[in-house]
């Protein structure tokens, strides 16, 4: 009998408390970068009933109305009704942003490689904003080269948001979660969806029967290809029986609490660093994007069916301390060849990544819900497949 395995990933909507925090942090980052592309930003957000606290470190000469950015972001998400216990115009906003530590700044502004060196490469100037390890991943399970469980989970909560904002389902409220369990065959290929879990906040008048019917018909069956669904697929829709109190009224939220949702749904390893609120000198963010860029181009070049890239850095040092690529036995060339090619083709110094992916632009708010990787609805530079030919040539 062939061995089949299950794998599960989850996603959350833009109205989930942790995602509200992520979106506020990235909206602040974008507002600052729009006025000062050289700014250093580390903006953290905490949300709870009736309150938003924004704190962290920034280095910029630009003025940004933090209060307005916070309120506009909350309104765009859909928290405009005081009945939700959290509303854009009535929430208390408490900013507390201070200047970046000069001890950190000296290592970021002048990397170890150029200190005391008159013959400087401009891309050696910026040192990594912290030590750490970052992972990027790609797999040929979907068109966007993402694991199927997280890809479907994102699409389910995005569909819920579309139906809410268009008022096609008028009783929906902003907070929601999804979870998809996929069955894989003995060759590690997805064959069917075993279980779908969706919890969506709703008005008190909505009945469980109506929610169940609408979610299956207008969300699940609109998003998940019928070839993955069968009579054994299990659906759990609002399994607690009621989800009226939600968002920050139901749970507090913090920036950086959904790092697995932001990446690969647990299918690949994670270095532990969050993305939102951080400018691109923070390698937690920029190197994770670079690692995805490498992995996706490797898989798109048919050099592997599955690729995981690890990068690691020392604070204040420009060059990565290590580059590792794992193809899990699916590669068509040696992993050492891929590692050598990656170092040749992709500039993995922080300034090199920033230049390669044009990361000084205000592009981050759009990434802060529904995943930073595998997005097909927006143009993200780390999702481009413009290094395929160079990789093929490098490993000949």
UniProtKB/Swiss-Prot annotation:
It catalyses: L-methionine + ATP + H2O = S-adenosyl-L-methionine + phosphate + diphosphate. GO terms for molecular function: ATP binding; magnesium ion binding; methionine adenosyltransferase activity. The keyword Electron transport does not apply. K(+) binds at residue 44. The keyword Transferase applies. Pathway: Amino-acid biosynthesis; S-adenosyl-L-methionine biosynthesis; S-adenosyl-L-methionine from L-methionine: step 1/1. It holds the Pfam family S-AdoMet_synt_C. PROSITE patterns: ADOMET_SYNTHASE_1, ADOMET_SYNTHASE_2. It is found in: Cytoplasm. Belongs to the AdoMet synthase family. Residues 100-110 are annotated as: Flexible loop. Binds 2 divalent ions per subunit. Keywords: ATP-binding, Cytoplasm, Magnesium, Metal-binding, Nucleotide-binding, One-carbon metabolism, Potassium, Transferase. L-methionine binds at residues 57, 100, 251, 282. InterPro entries: ADOMET_SYNTHASE_CS (IPR022631), S-AdoMet_synt_C (IPR022630), S-AdoMet_synt_central (IPR022629), S-AdoMet_synt_N (IPR022628), S-AdoMet_synthetase (IPR002133), S-AdoMet_synthetase_sfam (IPR022636). This is S-adenosylmethionine synthase. Mg(2+) binds at residue 18. ATP binds at residues 16, 175-177, 242-243, 251, 257-258, 274, 278. NCBIfam families: metK. Its cofactor is Mg(2+); K(+). GO terms for cellular component: cytoplasm.
């Amino acid at each position: 009998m062939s061995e089949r395995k299950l794998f599960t990933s989850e996603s959350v909507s833009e109205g989930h408390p942790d995602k509200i925090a992520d979106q506020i942090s990235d909206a602040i980052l974008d507002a600052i970068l729009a006025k000062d592309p050289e700014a250093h930003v580390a903006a953290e957000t905490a949300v709870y009933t009736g309150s938003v606290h924004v704190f962290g470190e920034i280095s910029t000469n630009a003025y940004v109305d933090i209060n307005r950015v916070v309120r506009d972001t909350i309104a765009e998400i859909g928290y405009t009704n005081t009945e939700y216990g959290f509303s854009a115009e009535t929430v208390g906003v408490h900013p507390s942003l201070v200047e970046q530590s000069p001890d950190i700044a000296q290592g970021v502004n002048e990397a170890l490689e150029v200190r005391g060196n008159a013959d400087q490469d401009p891309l050696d100037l910026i040192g990594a904003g912290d030590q750490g390890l970052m992972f990027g991943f790609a797999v040929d399970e979907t068109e966007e080269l993402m694991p199927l469980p997280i890809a479907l989970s994102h699409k389910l909560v995005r569909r819920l948001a579309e139906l809410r904002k268009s008022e096609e389902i008028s009783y929906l409220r902003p907070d929601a979660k999804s979870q998809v369990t996929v069955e894989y065959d003995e060759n590690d290929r997805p064959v069917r969806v075993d279980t779908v879990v969706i919890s969506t906040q709703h008005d008190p008048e909505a009945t469980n029967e109506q929610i169940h019917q609408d979610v299956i018909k207008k969300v699940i069956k609109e998003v998940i290809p019928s070839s993955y669904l069968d009579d054994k697929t299990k659906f759990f829709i609002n399994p607690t029986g009621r989800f009226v109190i939600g968002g920050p009224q139901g749970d507090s939220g913090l920036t950086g609490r959904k790092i697995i949702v932001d990446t690969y749904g647990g299918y690949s390893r994670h270095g532990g660093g969050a993305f939102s609120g951080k400018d691109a000198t923070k390698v937690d963010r920029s190197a994770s994007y670079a690692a995805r860029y490498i992995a996706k181009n490797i898989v798109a070049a048919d050099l592997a069916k599955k690729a995981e890239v690890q990068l690691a850095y020392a604070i204040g040092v420009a060059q990565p301390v290590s580059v590792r690529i794992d193809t899990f036995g699916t590669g068509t060339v040696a992993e050492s060849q891929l590692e050598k090619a990656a170092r040749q083709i992709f500039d993995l110094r922080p300034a090199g990544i920033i230049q390669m992916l044009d990361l000084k632009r205000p592009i981050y708010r759009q990434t802060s819900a529904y995943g930073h990787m595998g997005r097909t609805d927006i143009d993200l530079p780390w999702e481009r497949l413009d290094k395929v030919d160079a990789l093929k040539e490098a490993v000949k």
